[in-house]
């Protein structure tokens, strides 16, 4: 259940709400509203601070009850950490900490006043839209496949978060991005027996059909065969769940050239003949998170009605294994006409993407971005904090990096030097689909670059940033924030 958001300018000590959220720094300095409530309550917050109950350390919080002079029955005091280090990341964490602290409290409506805090190089509108994104992310609960009683328990709690401020533009953008992120997370978290290629196609088609200005075209196997998508169809051969190519369009920019996003949509990746093993295969439902992210970005763009043209392409495929599955040493012909020698069937993402990228050329993109959980090598290099970015275009790299920094959905650029290209040489085809042990994220990007010649193109490898690790890990919805901000910056 998504949070509901509103702006509120009522005096915090008299506002009607279940809880007012304030902050305290590690040096015991109170946020402006905390100072106001402290004065109204006769110094109660200061007294608790002096007693050591409120430390101000990041990650800590305390729920205070029935302060004298304060109408709200509860005040949540959130630790902000060191004041001189309080930046975008610390602000986002504090908002998330506040929402998580209220998870089990009998609070359905709260007023967040952390939006009043000064954040370096940010303004009031940013504070509000980032608070919306962070709060919605923290409040997210997966319930799609839970039983009735557990689903009811998970859906209880905070319903409405009022944010202190008046920047309506920040609220509108924040809600759009939050909805796009949540849409992507919901798709990514579904089990693969539900989120099949057909389900992904049906879900996105329904969204487009219910939002004026958006359209959706679904290409089936026969359409792809007619187009010569031999690489994509080779990956799909081993699965009973047939492939679909999803093409979403938002026409908000008249006759202008469109921005095109392509997202890897492997709804489950067994590895194929090069079968994955336990310790990795159980998380392969997340291999469609690139597709989910570009769909989520489309949702955000439609919700905020961006004045540009946007096309989203998702090759939705399951990489499974049967007697008809493609094999190592097969040579397949891509839509571009280039032949590809298969060195490993678990390097399937680049095969479905190369045909989707070739298909994208027909739209004459202003810029072409692909998003994929493409390589474990990228996760080894960058961990889960940063998305890997590769492009030959410095201006495009700077645009994407700047957008990511602005919304704290950050990326890090990796090289696409010519010296890596010869690692993809093949004796039997135009290109080999793997590049050896070293620089795997880069050679995967180099492979895709061979199918984007002449395009203003960038590749985002989200293998690390798309999901959290472990039994309780979930899809993150990244990089919906980065991509949406990048599109907003183009308007």
Swiss-Prot record:
Record flagged with keyword Membrane: no
Statement: the UniProt record of this protein carries the keyword tRNA processing: no
Cofactor note: Binds 2 manganese ions per subunit.
Coiled coil: none
InterPro entries for this protein: Leucine_aapep/pepB, Macro_dom-like, Peptidase_M17_C, Peptidase_M17_leu_NH2_pept, Peptidase_M17_N
Annotated EC: 3.4.11.1, 3.4.11.10
Binding site for Mn(2+) 2: 264, 269, 287, 348
Cofactor(s) this protein requires: Mn(2+)
Domain of life from the UniProt record: Bacteria
Active-site residues, record numbering mapped to chain: 276, 350
Membrane-spanning segments: none
UniProt KW keywords: Aminopeptidase, Cytoplasm, Hydrolase, Manganese, Metal-binding, Protease
Sites where the protein binds Mn(2+) 1: 269, 346, 348
SUPFAM superfamilies: Macro domain-like, Zn-dependent exopeptidases
The reaction(s) this protein catalyses: Release of an N-terminal amino acid, Xaa-|-Yaa-, in which Xaa is preferably Leu, but may be other amino acids including Pro although not Arg or Lys, and Yaa may be Pro. Amino acid amides and methyl esters are also readily hydrolyzed, but rates on arylamides are exceedingly low; Release of an N-terminal amino acid, preferentially leucine, but not glutamic or aspartic acids
Pfam family, any one: Peptidase_M17_N
GO process annotations (BP): proteolysis
Record GO terms (molecular function): manganese ion binding; metalloaminopeptidase activity
One GO cellular component term: cytoplasm
Location in or out of the cell: Cytoplasm
Disulphide-bonded residues: none
Family: Belongs to the peptidase M17 family.
HAMAP family on file: Cytosol_peptidase_M17
Function (record text): Presumably involved in the processing and regular turnover of intracellular proteins. Catalyzes the removal of unsubstituted N-terminal amino acids from various peptides.
Name under which the protein is recorded: Probable cytosol aminopeptidase
Lineage: Bacteria, Pseudomonadati, Pseudomonadota, Gammaproteobacteria, Lysobacterales
Gene: pepA
């Amino acid at each position: 259940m998504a949070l509901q958001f509103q702006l509120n300018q009522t005096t915090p000590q008299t506002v009607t709400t279940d809880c007012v959220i304030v902050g305290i720094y590690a040096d015991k300095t109170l946020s402006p509203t905390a100072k106001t409530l402290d004065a109204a309550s006769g110094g109660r917050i200061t007294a608790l601070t002096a007693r050591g109950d409120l430390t101000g350390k990041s990650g800590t919080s305390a729920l205070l009850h029935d302060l004298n002079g304060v109408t709200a029955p509860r005040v949540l005091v959130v630790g902000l950490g060191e004041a001189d280090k309080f930046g975008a990341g610390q602000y986002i964490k504090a908002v998330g900490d506040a929402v998580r602290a209220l998870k089990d409290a009998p609070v359905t409506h709260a007023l967040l006043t952390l939006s009043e805090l000064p954040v370096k190089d940010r303004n009031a509108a940013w504070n509000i839209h980032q608070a919306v994104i962070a709060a919605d992310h923290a409040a997210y609960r997966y319930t799609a496949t839970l039983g009735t009683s557990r689903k009811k328990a998970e859906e209880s709690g905070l319903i409405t978060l009022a944010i202190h401020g008046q920047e309506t533009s920040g609220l509108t953008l924040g809600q759009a991005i939050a909805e796009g992120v949540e849409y992507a997370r919901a798709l990514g978290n579904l089990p693969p027996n539900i989120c099949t290629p057909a389900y992904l196609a049906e879900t996105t088609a329904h969204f487009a059909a219910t939002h004026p200005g958006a359209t959706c075209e679904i290409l089936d196997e026969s359409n792809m065969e007619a187009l010569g998508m031999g690489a994509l169809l080779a990956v799909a051969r081993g699965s009973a769940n047939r492939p679909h190519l999803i093409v979403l369009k938002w026409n908000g920019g008249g006759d202008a050239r469109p921005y095109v996003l392509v997202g890897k949509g492997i709804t489950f990746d067994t590895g194929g003949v090069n079968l994955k093993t336990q310790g990795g295969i159980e998380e392969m439902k997340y291999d469609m998170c690139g597709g989910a992210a570009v769909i989520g970005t489309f949702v955000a763009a439609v919700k905020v009605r961006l004045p540009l043209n946007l096309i989203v392409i998702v090759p939705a495929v399951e990489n499974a294994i049967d007697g008809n599955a493609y094999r190592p040493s097969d040579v397949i012909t891509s839509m571009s006409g280039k032949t590809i020698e298969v060195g490993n069937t678990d390097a399937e993402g680049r095969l479905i993407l190369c045909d989707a990228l070739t298909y994208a050329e027909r739209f004459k993109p202003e810029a072409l971005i692909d998003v994929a959980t493409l390589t474990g090598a990228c996760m080894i290099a960058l961990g889960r904090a940063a998305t890997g970015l590769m492009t030959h275009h410095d201006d495009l790299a700077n645009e994407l990096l700047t957008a990511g920094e602005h919304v704290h959905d950050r990326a890090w650029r990796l090289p696409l030097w010519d010296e890596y290209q010869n690692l993809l040489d093949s004796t039997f085809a135009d290109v080999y689909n793997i590049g050896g042990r070293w620089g795997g994220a880069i050679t995967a990007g180099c492979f895709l670059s061979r199918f984007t010649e002449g395009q203003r193109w960038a590749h985002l490898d989200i293998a690390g940033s798309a999901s959290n690790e472990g039994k309780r890990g979930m899809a993150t919805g990244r990089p919906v924030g980065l991509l949406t901000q990048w599109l907003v910056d183009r308007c």
